[in-house]
Amino acid sequence: PYEKIGAELVKEVAKKTDDVAGDGTTTATVLAQALVKEGLRNVAAGANPLGLKRGIEKAVEKVTQTLLSSAKDVETKEQIAATAGISAGDQSIGDLIAEAMDKVGNEGVITVEESNTFGL
């Protein structure tokens, strides 16, 4: 039963990460799996589950604060291209994304669809 609960938790983490960020599902899945594994190991060794939960919540709050305080706005077309290129693993895709964002603006929407046309 614990394995099924853990699997459902990891699945939910991946889905929520994809819904919110659209990226990072692998990292979120690995972190969730490690938290579940270590949490169960600690509970089996006698740790208080509520204490573990509170500790995890405090850690999440601290990590979130640290990430937000070190975050930088991406404003220029060049910064967008560089960031998107790193995320896509392909600078030409980053350049296309920056071009599309330049055309639609900050509040615009860009829809990407798979095509059956090769090379276009």
Swiss-Prot record:
Subcellular location, record wording: Cytoplasm
InterPro entries registered for this protein in UniProt: Cpn60/GroEL, Cpn60/GroEL/TCP-1, GROEL-like_equatorial_sf, TCP-1-like_intermed_sf
Entry's Gene Ontology BP terms: protein refolding
Coiled coil: none
EC number of the protein: 5.6.1.7
Ligand binding (ATP): D23, G24, T25, T26, T27
Catalytic activity: ATP + H2O + a folded polypeptide = ADP + phosphate + an unfolded polypeptide
Annotated TM spans: none
Purpose: Together with its co-chaperonin GroES, plays an essential role in assisting protein folding. The GroEL-GroES system forms a nano-cage that allows encapsulation of the non-native substrate proteins and provides a physical environment optimized to promote and accelerate protein folding.
Assembly behavior: Forms a cylinder of 14 subunits composed of two heptameric rings stacked back-to-back. Interacts with the co-chaperonin GroES.
Family that this chain belongs to: Belongs to the chaperonin (HSP60) family.
Name of the protein: Chaperonin GroEL
Organism name: Mycobacterium asiaticum
Gene that produces this protein: groEL
